[in-house]
Amino acid sequence: MRLEVFCEDRLGLTRELLDLLVLRSIDLRGIEIDPIGRIYLNFAELEFTDFSSLMAEIRRISGVTDVRTVPWMPSEREHLALSALLEALPEPVLSLDMKSKVEMANPASCQLFAQSQERMRHHTAAQLINGFNFQRWLDGNPQSSHNEHVVINGQNFLMEITPVHLQNENDEYVLTGAVVMLRSTIRMGQQLQNLSTQDLSAFSQIIAVSAKMKHVVEQARKLAMLSAPLLITGDTGTGKDLFAYACHQASPRSAKPYLALNCASIPEDAVESELFGHAPEGKKGFFEQANGGSVLLDEIGEMSPRMQAKLLRFLNDGTFRRVGEDHEIHVDVRVICATQKNLVELVQKGLFREDLYYRLNVLTLNLPPLRDCPQDIMPLTELFVARFADEQGVPRPKLSADLSTVLTRYGWPGNVRQLKNAIYRALTQLEGYELRPQDILLPDYDAATVAVGEDAMEGSLDDITSRFERSVLTQLYRSYPSTRKLAKRLGVSHTAIANKLREYGLSQKKGEE
């Protein structure tokens, strides 16, 4: 029988409660005291009349506000919850003490080693896992999880060993043991395969924290539902292909094929057969294969004038002929085009058909460069760090406090792709458990030079001025890393600079200014 006593924080109250149990000759099996004003009692079953009388007497104790029966003591509830969790885990889990002896093993581990719970407690980790040296791991003063490949009963496992630190009476955290989890590589492969075949809710894979990216994603969600051609523009590495695929996945065509062709990577004479098919070889083209779905034509600005004419005809009525065949084929395909070039300039230079441009420019999605979305940089960094650490089977490193300042100040001419590659390169060569600015190699970047690129003259005068102003501040802030120094350099007030830095998302934490 277990009771939960609600009470005030009064000196001597617990003593009076225990005296009452002694007076009634009740065998107390356990007592637990909660700091928030609850006392839990565990004792043998009582007759109903004795129990009712005891409850009444407890309520008469000064400071007791209520009393009720409960099914478990707090420690019992925690133990049962932990046991249920361990039993539900499909992966074998072991709890080890400081001598590598098994203290606890879940059912999956008992099944793997063909041992009962009791017999498991008579083994050390080294006896169960061939080649595992617990002492060597211990001598390394472990502070975080460690992964290594092990073979058990002919099966391959990724073993993750995590140190367990508990707080002692001096408020110091001391190492008390470890938890070992064994992940079957076959099971992991199946899970990844299943994950890759699922419809990962279209835009859930796109990081959008900044207002600009949120607006683009919201716009893309609306455009995804339409069937008219979609033109996606943006600098290199901004994620045009990712948005194209997301638009397909979010559209009514998601159950149908999605195919992508890079117009710049295929010779001109091969593009036609790739898109429309080749009759002599019995080959179906992209448009025919993707009937009912979507086709991405990446780097559309690189398409030859002859192919531009054929594409325009297809966009007008959805019909085409395979190479070497006169028979017309009609398909229903949504065409998504992507380019990092300024198509208006190409039209003016006679390199891109004006009528095709207007046919493609019905629905347009313009992706901003990463330098214009500084709020997205750290969320993207955290995503890439987690992804690549997991892929490489290494612990996820901590991000140093000053990493954010360095990454958000950099101009990222290669945009998200450059950030992704920089993080990957840093993790492959990282020593230690912290990712610092010096671990990420970034080429020199002149923000002012980029500011006069193809997109610099788009929009109103205010838009153009803002882009140039942000570029100047981005470049100079690296050399004058405080608002006061930068204000002095530019000959304006500290307040004006602070406001501008906040406006463009370039400001550091207050304590760093």
From Swiss-Prot:
One Gene Ontology MF term: DNA-binding transcription activator activity
Ranges for domain ACT: 2-72
Domain PAS residues, every copy: 78-120
Gene3D superfamilies: 1.10.8.60, 3.30.70.260, Homeodomain-like, P-loop containing nucleotide triphosphate hydrolases, PAS domain
Keywords noted in UniProt: Activator, Aromatic hydrocarbons catabolism, ATP-binding, Cytoplasm, DNA-binding, Nucleotide-binding, Repressor, Transcription, Transcription regulation
Biological process annotations from GO: catabolic process; positive regulation of DNA-templated transcription
Subcellular location: Cytoplasm
Residues annotated to bind DNA: 482-502
InterPro entries assigned to the protein according to its UniProt record, in alphabetical order: AAA+_ATPase, ACT-like_dom_sf, ACT_dom, Homeodomain-like_sf, HTH_TyrR, P-loop_NTPase, PAS, PAS-like_dom_sf
Complex and partners: Homodimer. In presence of tyrosine (or high concentrations of phenylalanine or tryptophan) and ATP, it self-associates to form an hexamer.
Primary role: Dual transcriptional regulator of the TyrR regulon, which includes a number of genes coding for proteins involved in the biosynthesis or transport of the three aromatic amino acids, phenylalanine, tyrosine and tryptophan. These three aromatic amino acids act as effectors which bind to the TyrR protein to form an active regulatory protein. Acts by binding specifically to TyrR boxes in the promoter region of the target genes.
Protein name according to UniProt: HTH-type transcriptional regulatory protein TyrR
Lineage: Bacteria, Pseudomonadati, Pseudomonadota, Gammaproteobacteria, Enterobacterales
